[in-house]
Each structure stands twice: as structure tokens, then as C-alpha cells.
């Protein structure tokens, strides 16, 4: 019996429904009219008409189904409900494809304990569900999306989904048709797919082998229009395997939607309900609206996956301070995740004491020397530099920077010495990233350090009493997985301690703008009002306008009586500076006298009389330092220019434990991209593998040498590098967004700061610029005028940790002289700070030094292979090779554009050829030259970008052509930067070596 319908309202007749089917849909929060428009109950032979219609189905000569298929589908005769929608690919007519939920489901042949809940048309490709909706739902979606319904759309027989497609209405993709119906009911244009992998297809041959790239199913492709917001909202599952399966599906489908230029976001259901329909019914529409408003971009969501700790906690806490936590003696790997300022270091101090009571030595591994010294001071253990002159030596263990985990270091490190002992890796996430990517001392012996770390982990975990502690506010699966992968076949279950306590750090005022002038203006006003302030900076060099040194100079000029302490890597290692060695004793350094007061976080705190009005700190103060003094600082200020990770910014702001206002300026986009800059782990790894193979092949071909290397050295380390690189690259693209979101998660209330008047902020810019320039000019002159030292003196200075400013200048001068081979002038110092050396080096080997290039690359390659005992760390190896970059520039005929006197314009044939070639090979150019090319760039923009890698450019000389067709003209003008002198020095150096 047909349904009697009334437009705008439906007279519901239950003839087409069995009661349990009706109730099932109602219990999912679905509007009755939507149910009636799309769902019906079927029984007997009728379900066959809906499911068994494909011409691909094999039948007997009389047209009857084969016995096997009859047996397979016999269960559908017991009845069930059927649902289908409309077909956007067939003029929005009703879709033949749909789904049937049998009352008596059949067993899954592959999973005998599981039943197949839903049946879809046999031998037909899966489709998506576009449910019919009543007018009231259409209007509700219109109101929520803010997109009107023109009369022409309302009167169009193609209806609601044509309007959604035509007007770029945001859509939500869910798994399961009832979930889509539920979201439509509350005003969201929801599309359902039958499974998490049903939004895309991967071409395969008859044997199941993949023969092409994944692509969106046509239904979704139709709606994947540019700038449309598409949210993906799949079920929340508890099974680890299922969770991973769902996440992979979201990544793949999300990437394909992003390729179509959709704005892809992901809604993560918080639980406990599994599906979005259950969530809406249990928590209400307002709760889902909030989830929708807070949904994350695909990039943000992917990054978050690498930052989560999903290991089941053995101990869950929710307390301000960790206090005493008893760890069973049988536990080998202890993972501690607790917010900043909750007493992690204090708790670890107790664990160190316990190890000593049990006659176990303790190895403390950090990524910063100052942090290691501070921790050792707290733990009562010598830092490695103190071992020699200490009465206890290394009897209790020692602290060491991870850079020194090799035999040639001061530690003379041997992983076999730590059997049955304890290892503590504090701020483990930063330690591992420093190990895998830092360009500091560790890069020289990274392979050796990686080998020793792996042996250390295996020795400790395989010993009866050995223990490893991983501790950080940001420890994640990535860190735990990495350590477990290094353990190899040694199976250990992590003993995870999770403290869910979230401090209430107070207000954080965020300053907009392209530079932090408004923040400095606000700090000026705060200083005039009195109090004491902590200013955190991401830079420290004299050249940086917003770094520690320039700002110190600027504040001293503006406030001559202000007592300022600068804390950065130079000041803390300068014996003549007040900040020398201050990291381990910061609370005392900041103050004069005092008396003990109440306990904070399980340790005696001391309240002191003020000594400094302004403390300016670099990332030397990033981790492992706890400023516990109360009532001292009025506010914390931060200038973050995109060179630290987002987590490091949050760490730095949390060094002061007291709840005072934070004021920050964060650059919109960062600058520290890793690898090829991708946020895809697969892309990063594929790029490194391909570049390594190319480098080896080119060298072998060029010098006929056999480069036998272990290309598969520690794949677990390289995979962890790629995971972390994805996080860093995504953060750098949306740097400010990531930092602010992280601060919100830390409990801050982020508030937009008031704008500062143009005159006041411009005055700040002028004063900072003047201070920076004066300081930097003085430094360049001081370096150039410093005493020239011998090679042996230079080596001693390089190995020396504590250096005066004079010694740093001498070391810098010797380094520049060694690098360029010419007299060191203030101008040379300036240019070197401006990244001149890599530009000159590439230009030299493209031209005068081309004959020495293979020898140069081969020498570097053989050195790395020898140091690593046939193993290489691919990112380091690839950075050291120049031959592929030079070959690419030669292929692009770049030398043609360096011919003086030739005039160039964008329409020139040679420039258009260059553009076509660079666009065609843009990914190769990105991987080897680090230059990003897009189709939208002009030919002139492309050549200028390529020439900038050589420190060169085409100069604008004017416009030519008729008034209607005037074009900008350019020509190459040889630079007057004295690079010829450097090239000559390099040539003479090569000749001298060959003569010897």
C-alpha cells in the first residue's frame, strides 16, 4: 500500500514497516519523515529484487540463481529493512543501489564469530547514500550552513542534493546510512558510505595486485568541488587494530578530497558512544554542534595522531603533583606523561635515589648540556664533565647529552657498561628528535650514536634489574614505539603513568601582526608600571632584530636603570657573564637573599628579594628548568619566529610555574621544514630513499668506485624521523594556529591583545632596528679585528665549552678563514650570516669547480660510509651531496641566464621552456634543490627562485613593447660581492692539494 504524503508533512502509515525496524531508526535520532522517504521493510522473495539484479551474477540456463548463491542469500527471506536514496549521477532520480539489514544475518565465512550486518546489491560496486529529505530538513540545513535556497533551486525537481552540489554546501561524510539520517535530522548535509574504505577505490588486476593510484568513488568525486568544506566523522572504536584501520581510511580519503581542493576537516567523537547517531541521542545536538565547530583540519588531525599516547595507562592520576608513585621492581620500561609543572623531575629524583639504594648506576640522557647539568644537580649525580674531578667519579652514574653517546666523546661511551642499570631519558620526545634531525655535534657521528643507543636499550631491557624511564609532558606513541622498536626481539610491556591533571595557567594574550612590535610596545608600558618580567625569544644572534642580544641592547638604551639578565647559549657559557652556569641555579641567580617558605611540588621553594627587573631568555631555557619563585615575575612575554617546534614554545612559556599573564607573538608560518617539506610519512621516506639511490648511482657512474653501503640502516629510526618530520612540517605551515591551539589544550585562556597605536609601534620598530644594526656592525668588526689564531689554537677553542666573547670572536674568524680562504672582513662576516656560503658553493661547483665536484662528493660520501662502518643516515648523506643539484641546474641550462647583456622577458622561448621543464619536474627540483615550483608561478618568478640558490638574480631594467602589450625586461648583472676572490682562493687550495 503506497504512503499517503502531504508536502511539508507526511501522514505516516506503518504498512511498509515492521515495528522493530521503525523503532531502530527512531532510536538513532532520525526524523520520522526522513525514515518514511527512504526506508521500507521487506520480506519473503522481495529482498531478492533489491539485492540480486546485477548482470554480472552467474545464473543457470533457466535464469535461476546458482545453488551456492541461493544458499548464501536464503537468510534474506526472513525479512529486514531496505534503504536507498537518490542518484546524483543519474539526474537525481532514485538510486537502485542501497543496503538491506536482514533480521537474521549470515555468518562471515572469514570471521566465523562475526555476522554480516548489512547486505548490498550483489556483484555491484558500492555507492554512497544521498537520502531524500522533507522541506523542513532542507530549510534547517540552509539555516545552519548560512546558504540560502533560491526559488529556482526550490522549484527544481532535482531537489535538495542538487542544491547541495550547486551551492557548495558543506557536507559531512559518515559510515552507515542511519548516521547520515541522524545528522540530516539536526541540519547537516550528511553523505553516508557503507564502509570506511568505500569512499575511494584502488585499481587492481585480476590477481588482486595494485595497478594504479587510489581515486575517489564517482559519487564523492561529484561533490568534491573546490573550497567545499567536507568533514569526515567515523565511529570511535576501542580496538587498536580497528582504530588504525579507520585512521588510515580517513588519511587516504582526506588526501584525495584535498587534491580536489576541498577544505577537509575531521570530527573525532570523544566517546563513550561509538557512532555519531548514538552520540547525538545521548549527548544532544548542542554537543555535536560544538564538535563540528571545533573539528580539525586534515593536517592538524594527522599531526595529532603522532602526538597521542594511546597505550593503556597502568596508573591513571588526576592530581596537581605526582607525589609518591610505587613502581613494581619487575617493570622494565616506565613511561611518564604529566603536564608541565606537576613534579616530574621531583618524582624522578626519588627513582634515582631508589636505584642508588639498590646499587644501580643511573645514566641521564638529555638533548641540552645545560638541561643535563640542571638535572644532575637535582639528582645528586655528576654530569660527564664533572666525573674526572669528582670524588665519586661515575660511581653513581652520570648525565650526558645524547650527542656524546659514542667512544670518541668525553664520556668514552660504551653501551655494555649499563647492563643491570637505570637509564632516564627526560623530555624524551625532544631528545629523540634532536638525535634524529639536529645539525649540531651529533650529526658528525649520528650513525655511531644510533648504534650505541640501540645497544644500550637492548642491554638494559635484557638485564634482570635494568630499567628505562621515558618522561615528558608530550611523550607519545611515537616515542614509546621507537624505543620498543630499538629493543628488537626483547618484548617489554610499557608501564604507563598518565596524570590527567591540567593546570590552570591563566590568561595568554596573543598579539597579531607580521612582527612583534605591538608586544614590545606593551612590554614597554608594563616596565614603566614596575614589576619584573620574563621575555622568551626564539633567536639570540646579534643579527636577529627580535633576538636576545638586540632586545637587550634596545631595552638598555630605553631604560638605562633597568636591571637586565640575558640567558642564551653564549651568556651561560661565558665565564665573564652574570648568566654563566645559571641554568642549574636559576632561582638563586634571579634573586639576592631569602628564606625558605612553603613546599611547592614536593620540593622546598625559596622566596627571594628581587635582583633583575627583566630576564631575556633564548631556547636555552626551553626545558628542564623550573622557576619556582613566587610573587617575583609580573608576566611572561614571548616572541616566537617559527624556528622552534610548537611544543617547544609551550615548554618555554611554562618554565615559570606561577600563574601570571602570558603575552605572546607567534609568526603565522614557521621556517624549519624537514626533508622535502611534506606532511606525508610515505612521501618523506620515498624522497629520502630515491635521493640516496640517485646519489650513489651518480657517484658510482662518475668515479667507477664501488659504494657498498647498508641502505637499510635502522629503518625504525628513519620511520620515527619521518613521523616527527610530518608533525614539524604541518606545524610550520600553520605555526601560529598550532601554538595557540596547544596553549588552549594546556589550559590557557587565549585572548586577542589590544592593538597599539601606529606611532608607538613604529617607534618600537625603529629602536629595535637601530639597536640590532649597531650591535651587529660592532660584532662584525670585532670578529674581523680579532687576533688571528693558529690551527691548533682553533682546535682547542672548538673543543672548549666555556668561552669568553673574545674567544668566540677568534674562533669565528678562524672558521671563516678556513671556509672562504680569504681575509676576514666585516662584510664577509655579514654575508656569511646571510647564508652566503651554500650559495657560493653551489655557484662554484656549477662553474669553475665543476671538475672537482665528483671528487668532493665522493670524499664526503666515503668519509660518512667509513665513519658509519658502511652504514649511513640517509638525511645527512643526502644533504652532503651536491652533484644532483648541479646536474639539475645544468639540465635547466641555468648558465644561459647568467650571460651579461642578454635581455629577458617572461614570454621568451627560453624562459617558457624553463617553466615547462621545472613544472614537469617540480618534485625532483624540490627534493634536490629545496625549491618549490607551482604551475601558477610566472617564468620570471621561477628563474629568480632558481638563481637565488646561487645568490644571484636578474635585474629589472624597464618595460618594452606597445602600450597594450608592455612587458618587464630583465638582464643579468654580475654581482660585485667579491665572490671571484673566494673562487680563486678555492681554486688555489685545490691546486695546492694536487701538487702535494
Describe the residue ranges of each PLM region:
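Interdomain hinge/linker at the junction between the two RecA-like core domains of SF2 helicases
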Residues: 477-526
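SF2 helicase catalytic motif II
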Residues: 414-458, 467
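Conserved SF2 helicase motif VI
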Residues: 627, 633-661
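TOPRIM fold recognition
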Residues: 1-29, 33-35, 71, 163-169, ...
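Conserved strand-helix element at the start of the C-terminal RecA-like helicase core
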Residues: 360-372, 475-479, 520-555
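Inter-Walker segment of RecA-like/P-loop motor cores
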Residues: 379-417, 579-604
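Phosphate-handling DNA/RNA-contact segment within nucleic-acid enzymes
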Residues: 59-228
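Long, low-complexity intrinsically disordered regions enriched in Ser/Thr/Pro/Gly
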Residues: 571, 587, 594, 660-996
Amino acid at each position: 500500500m503506497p504512503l499517503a504524503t502531504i508536502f511539508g508533512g507526511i501522514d505516516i502509515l506503518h504498512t511498509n514497516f515492521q515495528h522493530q525496524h521503525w523503532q531502530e531508526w527512531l532510536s538513532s535520532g532520525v526524523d520520522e519523515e526522513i525514515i518514511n522517504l527512504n526506508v521500507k521493510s521487506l520480506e519473503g522473495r522481495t529482498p531478492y529484487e533489491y539485492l540480486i539484479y546485477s548482470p554480472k551474477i552467474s545464473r543457470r540456463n533457466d535464469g535461476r540463481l546458482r545453488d551456492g548463491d541461493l544458499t548464501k542469500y536464503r537468510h534474506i527471506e526472513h525479512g529486514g529493512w531496505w534503504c536507498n536514496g537518490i542518484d546524483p549521477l543519474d539526474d537525481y532520480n532514485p538510486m537502485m543501489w542501497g543496503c538491506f539489514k536482514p533480521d537474521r544475518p549470515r555468518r562471515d565465512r572469514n570471521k566465523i564469530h562475526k555476522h554480516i550486518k548489512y547486505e548490498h546489491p550483489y556483484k555491484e560496486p558500492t555507492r554512497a547514500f544521498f537520502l531524500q529529505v522533507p522541506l523542513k530538513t532542507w530549510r534547517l540545513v540552509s539555516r545552519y550552513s548560512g546558504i540560502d535556497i533560491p526559488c529556482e533551486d526550490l522549484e527544481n525537481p532535482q531537489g535538495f542534493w542538487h542544491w547541495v552540489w550547486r551551492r557548495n554546501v558543506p557536507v559531512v561524510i559518515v559510515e552507515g546510512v542511519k548516521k547520515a539520517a541522524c545528522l540530516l535530522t539536526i541540519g547537516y548535509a550528511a553523505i553516508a558510505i557503507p564502509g570506511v574504505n568505500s569512499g575511494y577505490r584502488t585499481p587492481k588486476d585480476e590477481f588482486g595486485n595494485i595497478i594504479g593510484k587510489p581515486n575517489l568513488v564517482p559519487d564523492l568525486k561529484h561533490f568534491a568541488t573546490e573550497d567545499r568544506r567536507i568533514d569526515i566523522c567515523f565511529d570511535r572504536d576501542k580496538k587498536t587494530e580497528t582504530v588504525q584501520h579507520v585512521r588510515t581510511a580517513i588519511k587516504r580519503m582526506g588526501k584525495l578530497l584535498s587534491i580536489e581542493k576541498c577544505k577537509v576537516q575531521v570530527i573525532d567523537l570523544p566517546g563513550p558512544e561509538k557512532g555519531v547517531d548514538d552520540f547525538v541521542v545521548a549527548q544532544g545536538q548542542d554537543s555535536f554542534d560544538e564538535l563540528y565547530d571545533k573539528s580539525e583540519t586534515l593536517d592538524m588531525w594527522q599531526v595529532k595522531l603522532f602526538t597521542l599516547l594511546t597505550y593503556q595507562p597502568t596508573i591513571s592520576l588526576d592530581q596537581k603533583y605526582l607525589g609518591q608513585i610505587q613502581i613494581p621492581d619487575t617493570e622494565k620500561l616506565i613511561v611518564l606523561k604529566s603536564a608541565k609543572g606537576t613534579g616530574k623531575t621531583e618524582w624522578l629524583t626519588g627513582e634515582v635515589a631508589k636505584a642508588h639504594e639498590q646499587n644501580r648506576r643511573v645514566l641521564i640522557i638529555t638533548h641540552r648540556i645545560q638541561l643535563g647539568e640542571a638535572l644532575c644537580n637535582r639528582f645528586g649525580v655528576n654530569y660527564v664533565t664533572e666525573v674526572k674531578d669528582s670524588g665519586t667519579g661515575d660511581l653513581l652514574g652520570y648525565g650526558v647529552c645524547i650527542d656524546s653517546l659514542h667512544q670518541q666523546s668525553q664520556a668514552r661511551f660504551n653501551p655494555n657498561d649499563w647492563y643491570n642499570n637505570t637509564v632516564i631519558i627526560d623530555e624524551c620526545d625532544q631528545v629523540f628528535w634532536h638525535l634524529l634531525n639536529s645539525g649540531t655535534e651529533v650529526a658528525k657521528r649520528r650513525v655511531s650514536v644510533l648504534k650505541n643507543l640501540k645497544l644500550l636499550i637492548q642491554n638494559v631491557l635484557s638485564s634482570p634489574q635494568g630499567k628505562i624511564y621515558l618522561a615528558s609532558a608530550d611523550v607519545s606513541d611515537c616515542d614509546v614505539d621507537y624505543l620498543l622498536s630499538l629493543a628488537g626481539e626483547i618484548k617489554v610491556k610499557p608501564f604507563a603513568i598518565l596524570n590527567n591533571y591540567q593546570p590552570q595557567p591563566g590568561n595568554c594574550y596573543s598579539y597579531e601582526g607580521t612582527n612583534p612590535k605591538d608586544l614590545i610596545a606593551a612590554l614597554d608600558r608594563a616596565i614603566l608600571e614596575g614589576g619584573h618580567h620574563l621575555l622568551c625569544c626564539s633567536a639570540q644572534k646579534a643579527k636577529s632584530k627580535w633576538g636576545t642580544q638586540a632586545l637587550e641592547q634596545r631595552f638598555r638604551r630605553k631604560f638605562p636603570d633597568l636591571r637586565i639578565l640575558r640567558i642564551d647559549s653564549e651568556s651561560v657559557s661565558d665565564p665573564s657573564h652574570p648568566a654563566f652556569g645559571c641554568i642549574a641555579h636559576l632561582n638563586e641567580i634571579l634573586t639576592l637573599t631569602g628564606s625558605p617558605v612553603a613546599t611547592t611540588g614536593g620540593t622546598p621553594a625559596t622566596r627571594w628579594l628581587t635582583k633583575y627587573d627583566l630576564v631575556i631568555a633564548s631556547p636555552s631555557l626551553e626545558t628542564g628548568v623550573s622557576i619556582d619563585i613566587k610573587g617575583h615575575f609580573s608576566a611572561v612575554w614571548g616572541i616566537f619566529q617559527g624556528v622552534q617546534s610548537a611544543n617547544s614554545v609551550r615548554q618555554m612559556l611554562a618554565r615559570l610555574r606561577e600563574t601570571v599573564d602570558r603575552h605572546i607573538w607567534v609568526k603565522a608560518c614557521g621556517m624549519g621544514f624537514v626533508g622535502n617539506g611534506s606532511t606525508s610519512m610515505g612521501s618523506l621516506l620515498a624522497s629520502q630513499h630515491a635521493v640516496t639511490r640517485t646519489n650513489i648511482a651518480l657517484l658510482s657512474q662518475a668515479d667507477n668506485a664501488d659504494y657498498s653501503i647498508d641502505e637499510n640502516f635502522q629503518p625504525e629510526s628513519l620511520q620515527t624521523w619521518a613521523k616527527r618530520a610530518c608533525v614539524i612540517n604541518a606545524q610550520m605551515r600553520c605555526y601560529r594556529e598550532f601554538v595557540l591551539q596547544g596553549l588552549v589544550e594546556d589550559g590557557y585562556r587565549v585572548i586577542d591583545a589590544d592593538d597599539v597605536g601606529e606611532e608607538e609601534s613604529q617607534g618600537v620598530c625603529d629602536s629595535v632596528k637601530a639597536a640590532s644594526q649597531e650591535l651587529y656592525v660592532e660584532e662584525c668588526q670585532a670578529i674581523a679585528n680579532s687576533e688571528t689564531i693558529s690551527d691548533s689554537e682553533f682546535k682547542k677553542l672548538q673543543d672548549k665549552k666555556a668561552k669568553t666573547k673574545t674567544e668566540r670572536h677568534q674562533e669565528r674568524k678562524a672558521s671563516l678563514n678556513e671556509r672562504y680562504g680569504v681575509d676576514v672582513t666585516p662584510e664577509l662576516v655579514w654575508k656569511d650570516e646571510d647564508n652566503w656560503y651554500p650559495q657560493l658553493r653551489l655557484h662554484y661547483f656549477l662553474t669553475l669547480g665543476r671538475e672537482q665536484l665528483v671528487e668532493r662528493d665522493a670524499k664526503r660520501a666515503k668519509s660518512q660510509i667509513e665513519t658509519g662502518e658502511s652504514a649511513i643516515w640517509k638525511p645527512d648523506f643526502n644533504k652532503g651531496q651536491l652533484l644532483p643539484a648541479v646536474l639539475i641546474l645544468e639540465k635547466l641550462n641555468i648558465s644561459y641566464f647568467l650571460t651579461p647583456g642578454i635581455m629577458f622577458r617572461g614570454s621568451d622561448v627560453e624562459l617558457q621552456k624553463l617553466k615547462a621543464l621545472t613544472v614537469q619536474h617540480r618534485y625532483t627540483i624540490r627534493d634536490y634543490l629545496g625549491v618549490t615550483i607551482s604551475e601558477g608561478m610566472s617564468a620570471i618568478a621561477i628563474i629568480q627562485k632558481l638563481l637565488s640558490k646561487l645568490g644571484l638574480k636578474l635585474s629589472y631594467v624597464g618595460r618594452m613593447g606597445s602600450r597594450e602589450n608592455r612587458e618587464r625586461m630583465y638582464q643579468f648583472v654580475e654581482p660585485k660581492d667579491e665572490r671571484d676572490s673566494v673562487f680563486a682562493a678555492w681554486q688555489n687550495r685545490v691546486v695546492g692539494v694536487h701538487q702535494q
